[in-house]
Amino acid sequence: MYLREDDVHLADVRCGSTTRGWSPLRPAPVFGLVLVRDGVLRGRSDGVEHVLDAASVFVERLGSEQQFAHPLGPDTFTEIVLSEPRVADLLGGDPTVPEGLVMVTPELALAHRLLLSRARRDADGFELAERTALFAAAVFARLAPDRVASGRPASAAARRRLADDARAVLAARPTVGLEALSRVVGASPHHLSRVFTAVTGSTLCAHRDRLRLARVLDRLNEGERDLAGLARELGYTDQSHMTRAVRRAVGMPPGRLRTLLTSGGA
């Protein structure tokens, strides 16, 4: 399990079943997206059969009667589980999921692998929550584009205000999570992420990382030596996480930066 929040889960699942026949009929316990990466699944949902492979995303509706079979044996898939409020956020306020298959475009395939790549490395909960919400929105946009588009703020001024409010909160509270940020500004995480990117040209995560980098540089310029404490203060997972982020941004670790800055760049 890479991400477990109230409204969204992200997991890498390996199903070791060797049963080729159908599983017992049961109601789907969650709203979810199933993205097969290796193998083939056959699914029945309310009597309709689907083939799930690496070129498709299966959109699972809570309560639908389901069965699955594994014709090639064990398979591996990514699962994104969404709460009913989060599904409603993604679908213009209506939590009714248009169940079925979405064919994977090259853009979706790449976004899926980038999401997993970040999850397996040093992405924190804020980044994963934003990436997962944006990915789920991209899937739903192919299944129900009008409903996904219906939640957009009505005017450019409203979009700008929302982005500005988010920037103000992030500047004051660098450790705030995506869910908390969304509550403060009065928008769903998905709509906030989408509007912020449209207005600023940057994701919320990238903007937050720039703010954190600026604070790191200022503190190093002041000679800060407690790097572990600085990492905790700014919301990094640990000192190693901060070191990787700083090195990725400016090409050198915090210790070398401190030496450079306190020596006047000589």
Residue ranges and their predicted role:
Residues 217-229, 233, 237, 263-266:
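Intrinsically disordered, low-complexity basic tails/linkers immediately adjacent to helix-turn-helix/homeobox/MYB/SANT
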Residues 93-152, 166:
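Amphipathic alpha-helical segments enriched in hydrophobic/aromatic residues interleaved with Lys/Arg
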Residues 155-166, 200, 209-212:
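N-terminal positioning helix adjacent to the helix-turn-helix/winged-helix DNA-binding module
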Residues 1-97:
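N-terminal regulatory/effector-sensing and dimerization cores
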Residues 115-123, 138-147, 165-177, 196-200, ...:
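Basic, amphipathic alpha-helical hairpins
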Residues 178-214, 231-260:
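Basic/polar phosphate-binding segments, predominantly the helix-turn-helix DNA-binding elements
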Residues 1-5, 255-266:
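Actinobacteria-biased recognition of intrinsically disordered, low-complexity terminal regions
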Residues 11, 34-35, 58-60, 78-87, ...:
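Hydrophobic alpha-helical membrane segments, chiefly transmembrane helices and signal peptide h-regions
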